[in-house]
Amino acid sequence: MEDAHAKKWEEVVDYFGVDPERGLALEQVKKNQEKYGPNELPAEEGKSLLTLILEQFDDLLVKILLLAAIISLVLALFEEHDDEAEQLTAYVEPFVILLILIANAVVGVWQEKNAESAIEALKEYEPEMGKVIRADKTGIQKIKARDLVPGDIVEISVGDKIPADLRLISILSTTLRIDQSILTGESVSVIKHTDPVPDPRAVNQDKKNMLFSGTNVSAGKARGVVMGTGLNTAIGSIRTQMFETEEMKTPLQQKLDEFGEQLSKVISVICVAVWAINIGHFNDPAHGGSWIKGAIYYFKIAVALAVAAIPEGLPAVITTCLALGTRRMAKKNAIVRSLPSVETLGCTSVICSDKTGTLTTNQMSVSRMFVFKDIPDDAAPELYQFELTGSTYEPIGETFMQGQKINAADYDAVKEITTICMMCNDSAIDFNEYKQAFEKVGEATETALIVLGEKLNPYNLSKAGKDRRSAALVVREDMDTRWKKEFTLEFSRDRKSMSSYCVPLKAGLLSNGPKMFVKGAPEGVLDRCTHVRVGTKKVPMTPAIMDKILEVTRAYGTGRDTLRCLALATIDDPMDPKDMDIIDSTKFVKYEQNCTFVGVVGMLDPPRKEVLDAIERCRAAGIRVIVITGDNKATAEAICRRIGVFGEDENTEGMAYTGREFDDLSVEGQRDAVARSRLFARVEPFHKSKIVEYLQGMGEISAMTGDGVNDAPALKKAEIGIAMGSGTAVAKSAAEMVLADDNFSTIVAAVEEGRAIYNNMKQFIRYLISSNIGEVVSIFLTAALGLPEALIPVQLLWVNLVTDGLPATALGFNPPDLDIMNKPPRRADEGLITGWLFFRYMAIGTYVGAATVGAAAHWFMMSPTGPGLNFYQLSHHLQCTPENEYFEGIDCEIFSDPHPMTMALSVLVTIEMLNAINSLSENQSLLVMPPWSNIWLISAICLSMTLHFVILYVEILSTVFQICPLTLTEWIVVLKISFPVLLLDEVLKFVARKYTDEFSFIK
């Protein structure tokens, strides 16, 4: 049934053909069960483990590595080996590659399994049982909630979880209050009624006659007819939205995917080229004159080239850097659930923030109040107007009047204000030892009045020597010695007030007999006020006094303050309780007559004190903050002015919309509104998702905050979903990040950390890529020039994973730039490598490759311990035979000597260490940013060199890597060949500082 909230309950009951007193007949129940299905959310069909594992290998770089491993394994199995050491070496390469791929897959599967929990977490809001009236049995019967069908008559009472979406048909108590915060984000429980809500487009917050599945009954008892079950409930539609939301890759993941595609194409071309260049050498004597053996030999070189070109250490280094970033964020109260989102934070351009609890404390607090000072006969009434500080439930704050700090106990009317706040109240504050914070017990507005009374402390009670909890309750405990509450007349919609009947326990200024203390909406209470309290006197109410009260109350409720106002009053001579019918709430208004007005208090959910600075930092960082709230527009605008989202006198036209106003716009109008607006008020969950969609369409990277079940679809859809630590399990499961302290300024700190991490990641990604270019150039040169192998695959794997991996990880500890939050966010499509940088790394890579090959050639041609070959002999080494006159007097076994390979590997490792020092800064000279500015990098370089010495000088390892120890003379040659890379990069950095080229190569 559409728009049940807009129809009379009798129409709804008729639609289902149900008698509200007897319920559905069994035939109707069966028919509806067949038609609508069970009242439960379908279980999530997760991907099988095999599917998840296979998905991890659906990546070009991974496929190339896998192919390289398989080919290496096949060659190792079928090739003849001279000795056991050579055979072991042949198997090391495929084994290590497979180990890397398996580790990568395990991490990926674990992350995906975690992400699937969001939809399952919704199940916790499904109630297990429901109380139903059905024609087959008399009275109320308890059944499983899953067996409820549309048309069932359900009874609910305090403490129950609503078992399905219901249309109220009768309220069986004075009032019915529902806590629907998980669904609508409202911070206070909502009073429900049975009257139609004539607006067919009403948002869930305004459907006061509807009860939603999964929400809780705070007070009262009622009956309703089931309107929706399973997926046809409000919570079911949220499940559908979450199910339909596709996971998006982060900007970095997209960049790396594109980089992988480009790299795979380049690798394919180079591998084919190397193989093709050497077709003429397939028949060389070294291959036994066999064309097939020669083809396989050069095929192995092509495989080695593929291994050299892929930065195998990159996934591990990125994961390590992100994991370290999450640890730093956790110290700032930002708990990251999804590793890739750490980097995404760095390019966040829009933060869509919930108001309640994120920008504000979600702890109602009285900030202003007034009482009468004097009412002269011939002049306007005079007021005492008080301002109070403190924005939490801890009763610490000061009282000011006209900017001057005062002692509230000096004013007689304050004693009466405090008495009404304390006695006409069913709530309290409690100290949570675990959180070391004060919390409300009961209603937020009533708790604010309790805190006000404790702050005012009108009898100057001493708090000395008391702990935090005891000091916060001194006024409450003192009040209990002065007054005894006999009964309460609960709040009702018709009179918009509540009252308590109290008797004095000891004599005092106010306690000269029983009194009724009244609080409620100003217009409702003032209509029943005949007098006004001025100090300790009672003055008759006049139209002028009434106008003054309404004028100041309106000022409190509008403009910058937009406070929620309550009028406080007393009845000095109440009716005898024997004459009151305290069961029938329709008569309460008769008992609350002849009131004496005492004062008005104005309260709000106050902004967090650190938010103003955080918003300013966002503005400096080029990040737009959009406030999205279920609260009304006026209140939201007032808070936005206080925290700096809007200026004090800024016109908000075109920059603030309600959900209804947004819906009324055309698609183009909605897009423009999202592009400009800074506030969306009175919105529903689907509005949040729609706003995220528009932002994504504009190329913005959005962070979305939320805490309720209703926020989960938008949290899942946004690039960064941010849940509150105090939020629901569903919101936390759907989010990438959880704020332990629910604080907006924590988001800004996390964005700063994200930017720093991205900058460092750029440095080590570029470092690793330039290293791989050097390795590719090295293999290409040896193959193209016909030189002996300078590096073999197992050595390349060692360099890529261990020797390069450690300094690359250490580059993640580079200190952040001081002006990191004074720059606009980077574009999501910004390239990892610009054209100029590509040229730089090609220049460095070419030097690395040439130096590596040169080191091996140096040993063959110029070393005192080498054979002293000429270039022709070196480049035609495969033609070496005892009969060949060009190789007369040369032992052909010399080409298998481990020395030249050791020289090449040592030069490669040393150059990479110097290259890591170059990567401390993209453009800054080492004279400005010396190596010791990152002590972790120095440690990593020392460790890498130590590991290199280990494989050189530990015999079993040197056998595996086919290398040997070097002499001091040979090490001096290694350093001479390696050192110029520092000078080369310094020259390139100097050119970059003078003439920067911004066009992007990898987009």
From Swiss-Prot:
InterPro entries: ATPase_P-typ_cation-transptr_C (IPR006068), ATPase_P-typ_cation-transptr_N (IPR004014), ATPase_P-typ_cyto_dom_N (IPR023299), ATPase_P-typ_P_site (IPR018303), ATPase_P-typ_TM_dom_sf (IPR023298), ATPase_P-typ_transduc_dom_A_sf (IPR008250), HAD-like_sf (IPR036412), HAD_sf (IPR023214)
Residues noted as binding ATP in the record, renumbered to the chain: 519
Main location: membrane
Top-level EC class as recorded in UniProt: translocase
Keyword Transport: yes
Highest taxon of the lineage: Eukaryota
UniProtKB keywords: ATP-binding, Calcium, Calcium transport, Ion transport, Magnesium, Membrane, Nucleotide-binding, Phosphoprotein, Sarcoplasmic reticulum, Translocase, Transmembrane, Transmembrane helix, Transport
UniProt GO molecular function: ATP binding; ATP hydrolysis activity; P-type calcium transporter activity
Annotated transmembrane regions: 60-78, 90-110, 263-282, 301-318, 776-799, 841-863, 899-917, 935-954
Gene3D superfamilies: Calcium-transporting ATPase, cytoplasmic domain N (3.40.1110.10), Calcium-transporting ATPase, cytoplasmic transduction domain A (2.70.150.10), Calcium-transporting ATPase, transmembrane domain (1.20.1110.10), HAD superfamily/HAD-like (3.40.50.1000)
GO CC terms of this entry: sarcoplasmic reticulum membrane
Catalytic activity: Ca(2+)(in) + ATP + H2O = Ca(2+)(out) + ADP + phosphate + H(+)
Active-site residue list: 354
Subcellular location: Sarcoplasmic reticulum membrane
This enzyme's EC code(s): 7.2.2.10
PANTHER family: CALCIUM-TRANSPORTING ATPASE (PTHR42861)
Stored NCBIfam families: ATPase-IIA1_Ca (TIGR01116), ATPase_P-type (TIGR01494)
Family label: Belongs to the cation transport ATPase (P-type) (TC 3.A.3) family.
Protein name per its UniProtKB record: Calcium-transporting ATPase sarcoplasmic/endoplasmic reticulum type
